[in-house]
């Protein structure tokens, strides 16, 4: 069943909100990166501080890349709405159920088609490529970032206590 006008409007506004949020986060992350850069300029920090700064910068870059890709997906979905092709699976041509679009408004495929693509990626991709995709998923998960950060601090504390 095709999306109703109300459903389409709801999803359109949801995509616009995501677009604004992702654009706003980009500016916030850029200013945070500048602050980190200022902290490291001309100040002789402890080696652990340098390691933390490098890790923070790498995490920021990865998060920026994920946000950039997500913003592209959101923009693509908005363009599909204008073109009249929104909600149609790119792989099968079937309509994407409203429930899926409600959960993932920028979805380009049905759940089944997406699972097939991901299965193909897992079987076709070299192991290092799968590991990279898993790392990106981990880095996009705030709980994982917090956990890795706390583990890093625990290790640094133990190293400093042992001296």
Curated annotation (Swiss-Prot):
Signal peptide location: none
Keywords: Metal-binding, Stress response, Zinc, Zinc-finger
Domain of life: Bacteria
Keyword Zinc in annotation: yes
Region of interest (Disordered), residue spans: 19-55, 115-163
Recorded GO MF terms: zinc ion binding
Name of protein: General stress protein 16O
Gene transcribed to yield this protein: yocK
């Amino acid at each position: 069943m095709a999306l109703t006008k109300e459903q389409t409007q709801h999803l359109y506004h949801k995509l616009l909100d995501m677009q604004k949020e992702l654009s706003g986060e980009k500016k916030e992350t850029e200013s945070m990166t500048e602050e980190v850069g200022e902290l490291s300029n001309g100040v002789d920090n402890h080696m652990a501080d340098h390691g933390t700064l490098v890790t923070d910068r790498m995490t920021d870059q990865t998060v920026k890349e994920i946000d950039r890709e997500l913003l592209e997906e959101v923009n693509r979905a908005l363009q599909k709405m204008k073109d009249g092709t929104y909600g149609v699976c790119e792989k099968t041509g079937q309509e994407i159920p409203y429930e899926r679009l409600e959960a993932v408004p920028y979805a380009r495929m049905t759940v089944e088609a997406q699972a097939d693509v991901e299965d193909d990626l897992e079987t076709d991709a070299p192991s290092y490529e799968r590991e990279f995709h898993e790392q990106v998923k981990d880095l996009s998960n705030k709980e994982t970032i917090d956990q890795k950060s706390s583990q890093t601090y625990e290790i640094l504390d133990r190293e400093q206590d042992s001296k």
